[in-house]
Amino acid sequence: MISDKIKLTAKDILEKEFKTGMRGYQQEEVDKFLDMIIKDYEAFHKEFEQLKQQNARLKRELEEQKLAATQVPQQPVQTPVAQPVYNNTNTDILKRLSNLEKAVFGSKLYE
């Protein structure tokens, strides 16, 4: 796990003491830099903890869904039977009726 690989904490960074030599570092500059590191480190730690909690929650939800899926009885899937489709509109019906009348009565008119 990642927490096993982390060797420093924000507290370790804050309490770190550096020895100064004759021409050593500028203590104020190092302190400012360490403060920035501490803030970032704390932000990363907070984000890491939130992600761990989210990961645990998502794992629980996944297990609950798996359990619910195994408890649902498997029902055979029924394919819908094709029903005849009647999409005739009134105009289509009137045209067909008119054609039938012409066919029936039109032949009688010419006899």
UniProtKB/Swiss-Prot annotation:
Principal subcellular localization = cytoplasm
Q: Does the keyword Ion transport apply?
A: no
Q: Name one GO biological process term.
A: cell division
GO CC annotations?
A: cytoplasm
Q: Which UniProt keywords apply?
A: Cell cycle, Cell division, Cell shape, Coiled coil, Cytoplasm
Q: Which residues form a coiled coil?
A: 38-72
| Gene3D superfamilies recorded | 6.10.250.660
| Coiled coil keyword on record | yes
Q: Which cellular compartments is it found in?
A: Cytoplasm
What role does it play?
Answer: Divisome component that associates with the complex late in its assembly, after the Z-ring is formed, and is dependent on DivIC and PBP2B for its recruitment to the divisome. Together with EzrA, is a key component of the system that regulates PBP1 localization during cell cycle progression. Its main role could be the removal of PBP1 from the cell pole after pole maturation is completed. Also contributes to the recruitment of PBP1 to the division complex. Not essential for septum formation.
Q: How does it assemble?
A: Forms polymers through the coiled coil domains. Interacts with PBP1, MreC and EzrA.
Q: Which family does it belong to?
A: Belongs to the GpsB family.
What's the protein name?
Cell cycle protein GpsB
